[in-house]
């Protein structure tokens, strides 16, 4: 009996409810209004009175985790069952039924089922997917329901569309899955064997085929080792045979098909045909056959006969010899037969493997575990001592080379010049390849003491010419002193079997005395091209190597302080420069003959000051002295005192801008351009000036300079152009301070 609807007796069940939408029960199908589904819930998703909604998926017990949909929880999970089917056959002459094996796949995410039949070779049945994936209904009278996971178990039967499948086993994942959802899994059941396939297998085992085919699978080996080649260095010693010699070979073993090719290393000018292939690529038999096989004698299989007909759509055929009568068994070289020190038989030739490349070593180490890859020594035997050929002495007719050629060949031939050297050292463009030296005749005759010569050495053919510049009213004709020819070294016999030695280019350098056909010449200087050539080829001219010269000076490091004081005393203007003669005299007193004259020239050329800088500096200082003399300005000590006062750190240097400000404030009688030019000459890399050196150079009373000479309107001869009389000194001024830093590592105080 229901309670009356009085206050306190009725309960509102919709309190806290937020979902009140109505389900759509009607829709259109082919433009016809109809009831879409009768399984949709009522208002708010609650079922109607008496309505039972069938679940879309199997009902699994909920765990303690999050309640996720089945298509997420069981994604990529498949249950696999092994089943078989007994199928009746129409032709019962051999058997009454067939056993067909299937794989049943159940997808728990949506309860779909798929049935596949594994392929059996020569079964005569259509195999593959038997039932595609979808939900399968239960057999009548429950056709309104679908198969779920609880309908599957080992030892049970399932009916799909009238066909009964007997499940006899499942995989480990399926067995574990069923146990987790509470299903007791039965043990596996023995599956019956197909009687028809059993009969066929027994027949095949007792029948020998008339056309037996031998399966030879080489694809795997080809794909695994394609492009991988073993390389061995070999030697075929054929010196024991007549006109035989030693042959250097390279053996390539192709791992993809076990073939071998051999190439020959032909030495230069061997006289052999330019055919590098010694053995074409093929399989190499271990045992050399006694004779060459005839065509068709070596085949993979023997063919008994062939048959064919002109009937259309009928293929020709042939029969193999299954007993393999007359087959030649050959054993070929494999990679396991090749190793260092092994001698292989290459069609009757004994080839020694004495070395291999790095890939071959790594291959044998990884596959066979070989660690020792010591190469085999195969040096040729020492040749017999060569009999020295003796030639008759020079007879005095013609040149020594022509006389020697007459003794070598039966038919006299001219002497062959070194054409390669001639082409490389011949003059072309701005390169003359001629070394010119300024020399003086060494003699006791007073008349010849002042004679000067130009000695030219031609690098193309090692010839020498001597020229004497013509001077007027000297009493000497001058001109060509020695025509171009090769000059022999003194002290050699004239009539001898060996060729004479001649003066070489490496024996000429500044300071050396050369004997030219009995005349002694002392080399005083050289032109710019010669000095540059000698400095570029220090391996042939060690006296032109600056590093070697500085190493000799470093041996006198104990005199470095004294040497610095001597240079400072010689540099009265504090310009860190001295003239060449002063520089040479100071170094000569220090080394006491340890340095050659060529080394002095090399050092002077490296540390020389450009002539434009020196002349510009002297010109500016002379111009400033002239201004000071006109204005009678002598107050230089005041400038030095002011600079000392400004120099708080006592470094003897001040910034350029401070010295310029001091000069302008003290009314120094110099124009702005001249002052800027002088400051730039004394400025260092840090924009600072040694104020003592600067004002000492400007002091025209203590450090006077020659007065400016008026410009000459006569045309003067340029000293840089080679006129046969080179400059007696290599440089006018030398930067001695840079030299001291490089040679002894001295720093400025």
Swiss-Prot record:
The protein's role, per its UniProt record: Microtubule inner protein (MIP) part of the dynein-decorated doublet microtubules (DMTs) in cilia axoneme, which is required for motile cilia beating.
Location(s) in or outside the cell: Cytoplasm, Cytoskeleton, Cilium axoneme; Cytoplasm, Cytoskeleton, Flagellum axoneme
Entry GO terms, CC: axonemal A tubule inner sheath; axonemal microtubule; ciliary basal body; sperm flagellum
Domain EF-hand, residue spans: 558-593
Alphabetized Pfam families for the sequence: DM10_dom
GO biological process terms, semicolon-separated: cellular response to leukemia inhibitory factor; flagellated sperm motility; regulation of neuron projection development
Tissue-wise expression: Expressed in airway epithelial cells.
GO molecular function: calcium ion binding
Primary residence: cytoplasm
Alphabetical keyword list: Cell projection, Cilium, Cytoplasm, Cytoskeleton, Flagellum, Repeat
Disulfide bonds: none
Assembly and interaction partners: Microtubule inner protein component of sperm flagellar doublet microtubules.
InterPro entries per record: DM10_dom, EF-hand-dom_pair, EF_hand_dom, EFHC1/EFHC2/EFHB
Organism domain of life: Eukaryota
Domain DM10: 75-182, 226-368, 431-538
UniProt name for this protein: EF-hand domain-containing family member C2
């Amino acid at each position: 009996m229901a309670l009356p609807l009085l206050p306190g007796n009725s309960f509102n069940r919709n309190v806290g409810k937020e979902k009140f939408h109505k389900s759509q029960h009607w829709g259109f199908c082919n433009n016809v209004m109809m009831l879409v589904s009768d399984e949709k819930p009522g208002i708010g998703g609650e079922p109607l009175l008496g309505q039972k909604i069938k679940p879309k998926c199997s009902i699994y017990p909920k765990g303690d985790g999050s309640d996720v949909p089945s298509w997420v929880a069981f994604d990529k999970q498949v249950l696999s069952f092994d089943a078989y089917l007994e199928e009746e056959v129409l032709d019962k002459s051999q058997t009454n039924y067939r056993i067909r094996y299937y794989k049943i796949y159940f997808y728990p995410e949506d309860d779909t089922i798929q049935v596949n039949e594994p392929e059996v070779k020569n079964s005569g049945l259509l195999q593959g997917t038997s039932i595609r994936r979808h939900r399968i209904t239960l057999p009548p009278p429950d056709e309104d329901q679908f198969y779920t996971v609880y309908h599957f178990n080992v030892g049970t039967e399932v009916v799909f569309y009238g066909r009964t499948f007997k499940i006899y086993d499942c995989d480990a994942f399926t067995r574990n899955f069923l146990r987790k959802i509470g299903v007791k899994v039965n043990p596996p059941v023995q599956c019956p064997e197909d009687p028809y396939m059993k009969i066929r297998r027994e027949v095949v085992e007792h029948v020998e085929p008339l056309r037996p085919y031998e399966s030879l699978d080489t694809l795997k080996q080809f794909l695994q080792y394609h492009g991988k080649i073993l390389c061995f260095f070999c030697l075929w010693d054929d010196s024991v045979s007549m006109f035989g010699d030693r042959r250097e070979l390279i053996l390539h073993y192709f791992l993809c098909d076990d073939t071998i090719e051999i190439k020959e290393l032909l030495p230069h000018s061997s006289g052999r045909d330019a055919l590098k292939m010694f053995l074409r690529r093929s399989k190499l038999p271990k045992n050399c056959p006694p004779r060459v096989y005839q065509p068709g004698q070596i085949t993979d299989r023997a063919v008994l006969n062939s048959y064919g007909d002109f009937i259309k759509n009928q293929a020709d055929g042939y029969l193999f010899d299954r007993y393999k009568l007359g087959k030649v068994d050959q054993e070929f070289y494999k990679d396991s037969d090749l190793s260092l020190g092994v001698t292989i038989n290459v069609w009757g030739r004994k080839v020694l493997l004495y070395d291999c490349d790095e890939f071959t070593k790594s291959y044998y180490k990884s596959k066979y575990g070989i660690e020792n890859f010591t190469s085999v020594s195969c040096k040729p035997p020492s040749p017999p001592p060569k009999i020295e050929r003796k030639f008759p002495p020079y007879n005095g007719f013609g040149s020594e080379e022509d006389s020697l050629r007459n003794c070598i060949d039966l038919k006299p031939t001219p002497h062959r010049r070194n054409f390669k050297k001639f082409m490389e050292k011949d003059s072309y463009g701005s390169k003359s390849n001629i070394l010119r030296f300024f020399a003086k005749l060494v003699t006791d005759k007073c008349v010849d003491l002042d004679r000067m010569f130009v000695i030219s050495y031609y690098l193309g053919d090692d010839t020498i010419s001597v020229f004497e510049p013509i001077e007027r009213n000297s009493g000497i004709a001058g001109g060509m002193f020695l025509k171009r020819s090769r000059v022999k070294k003194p002290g050699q016999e004239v009539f001898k079997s060996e060729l004479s030695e001649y003066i070489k280019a490496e024996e000429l350098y500044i300071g050396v005395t050369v004997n030219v056909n009995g005349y002694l010449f002392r080399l005083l200087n050289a032109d710019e091209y010669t000095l540059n050539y000698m400095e570029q080829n220090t391996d042939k001219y060690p006296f032109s190597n600056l590093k070697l010269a500085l190493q000799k000076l470093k041996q006198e490091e104990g005199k470095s302080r004294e040497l610095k004081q001597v240079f400072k005393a010689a540099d009265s203007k504090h310009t860190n420069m001295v003239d060449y003669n002063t520089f040479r005299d100071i170094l000569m007193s220090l080394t006491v003959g340890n340095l050659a004259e060529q080394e002095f020239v090399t050092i002077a050329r490296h540390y020389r000051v450009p002539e434009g800088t020196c002349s510009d500096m002297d010109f500016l200082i002379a111009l400033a002295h002239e201004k000071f003399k006109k204005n009678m300005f002598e107050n230089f000590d005041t400038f030095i005192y002011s600079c000392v006062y400004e120099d708080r750190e006592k470094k003897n240097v001040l910034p350029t801008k401070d010295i310029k400000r001091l000069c302008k404030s003290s009314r120094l009688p110099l124009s702005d351009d001249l002052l800027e030019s002088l400051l730039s000459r004394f400025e260092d890399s840090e924009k600072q000036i040694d104020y003592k050196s600067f004002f000492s150079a400007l002091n025209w009373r203590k450090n006077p300079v020659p007065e400016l000479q008026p410009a000459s309107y006569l045309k003067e001869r340029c000293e840089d152009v080679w006129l046969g009389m080179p400059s007696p000194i290599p440089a006018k001024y030398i930067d001695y301070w840079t030299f001291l830093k490089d040679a002894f590592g001295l720093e400025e105080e």
